[in-house]
Regions:
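C-terminal hydrophobic helical "lid"/dimerization subdomain
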Residues: 2-7, 279-355
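Glycine-rich beta-strand-centered segment in the early N-terminal region that forms part
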Residues: 29-47, 59-103
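NAD(P)H dinucleotide-binding glycine-rich loop of Rossmann-like/cofactor-binding domains
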Residues: 66-68, 75, 90, 100-163
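Short glycine-centered segments of the SAM/dcSAM-binding site in methyltransferase folds
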Residues: 96, 158, 247-248
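Mid-domain Rossmann-like dinucleotide-binding core that forms the NAD(H)/NADP(H) cofactor-binding site
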Residues: 134-209
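Glycine-rich cofactor phosphate-binding loops and adjacent beta1-alpha1 units
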Residues: 194, 199, 203-268, 354-355
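Glycine-rich phosphate-binding loop and adjacent beta-alpha segment
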Residues: 231-296, 329-342, 347
Length: 355
């Protein structure tokens, strides 16, 4: 196994589950690398809508996991392989990779280093930057699982993507186009509409002000074939009235309220968990063409935050933004390691206010 160059690292870790006040910048040991794992020097980590759920202990309860503290957050990440386990053959130190680290027992990607099972790691596909790749994994896999496994999307089918300017949605638009579908997208705000048009959707409406059902019927006069729903509520259910009889609807587990399509339409929740075959298929789609007029696959980054501003990144999850938020891990690490205030928690009070 190639040797790592340092024994400790900076990480955003929890000593208990709870609110923002539990997130502290700590100095922790660099995780040991198992035989079927790789050690990634993390450059970027995605900040997802599910991260507060994990921070509050939701995933530990959901999966029946006994948590080990300090608990490092971060389900998405990208960087460079620093070391590989003895049984790893397909990847090597120096490879640029992205990784899934959801409820990883050795810690997530809100850290300088992460040890992750090789089955959950892939070389970065296409022309994606490390920043884009670090923001992408869970949302891209969730979009892909919905389109491919759950909906069985076919070329020339019409699809409604509700929440098309969000993390999952803006990636689903591009994947659906690469699968040959006709995409009717519902975005949030004029900026969201502009983004989704740029990403190649065939038609885009603003979910806050447009008549979605009327526009959908104009787009697909015989009714929409399928729908991928990433946000629930009255507007979603009204949009689903434009589905054809026998249509198919999918939504990731956790979408609330759950969508309620008309009778006669199949509606399934699903999980977006990765496996090596799905990761390979996702990579091939990313590297393929999205059709005439479409550019390279894009992971839209709304804002980036340095590692020691992870709390601000979590606060930003409740604001209006397009695409994804990220933490820049490999950012001025000398400052993080030398600043004496970092020996103490980032927060002094229970209200999460900076010291």
């Amino acid at each position: 196994m190639s040797q790592k160059t340092q024994s400790t690292m900076k990480a955003i870790a929890l000593d208990r589950f709870g609110g923002l006040e539990t997130m502290k910048l700590q100095t922790l040991p660099v995780p040991e690398v198992g035989a079927n794992e790789v050690l990634i020097q993390v450059e970027w980590a995605g900040v997802g809508k599910w991260d507060p759920f994990e921070r509050e202990g939701g995933f530990a309860t959901l999966f029946g996991i006994e948590p080990k503290f300090p608990y490092v957050l971060g389900s998405d990440g990208a960087g460079t392989i620093a070391a590989v386990g003895d049984d790893v053959k397909e990847l090597k130190p120096g490879d640029r990779v992205y990784a899934f680290s959801l409820v990883n027992p050795k810690g997530g990607c809100y850290a300088e280093y992460a040890a992750i099972k090789v089955d959950d790691v892939s070389r970065i596909p296409g022309r994606l930057t490390s920043q884009q790749a670090g923001a992408m994994p869970v949302d891209a896999m969730t979009a892909f699982r919905g389109l491919d496994d759950t909906l069985g999307l076919k070329a020339a089918e019409s699809i409604l993507i509700f929440g098309a300017s969000g993390g999952i949605g803006h990636l689903a638009v591009q994947l659906a186009k690469r699968m040959g579908a006709r995409v009717f997208a519902v975005a949030s705000g004029s900026d969201g509409v502009a983004l989704v048009k740029k990403l190649g959707a065939d038609a885009v409406v603003d979910g806050h002000k447009d008549d979605i059902a009327a526009a959908a019927r104009q787009f697909a006069s015989n009714g929409l074939d399928v729908a991928l729903i990433t946000a629930g509520g009255p507007a979603t259910d009204k949009a689903l009235t434009a589905m054809r009889a026998g249509g198919r609807v999918a939504y990731p587990n956790g979408v609330e309220p759950e969508p309620k399509p008309p009778q006669g339409i199949d509606c399934k929740p699903y999980d977006g968990m990765p496996d090596p075959q799905a990761i390979q298929k996702l990579n091939r789609l990313i590297e393929s063409s999205g059709g005439p007029g479409s550019g390279s696959f894009e992971v839209h980054i709304a804002r980036s935050f340095p590692l020691d501003q992870a709390v601000e990144a979590h606060r930003a999850l409740d604001e209006h933004y397009l695409g994804k938020l990220v933490l820049q891990i490999a950012w001025d690490l000398r400052r993080l390691h030398n600043n004496s205030m970092i020996a103490n928690p980032l927060f002094s009070g229970d209200d999460g206010s900076p010291t």
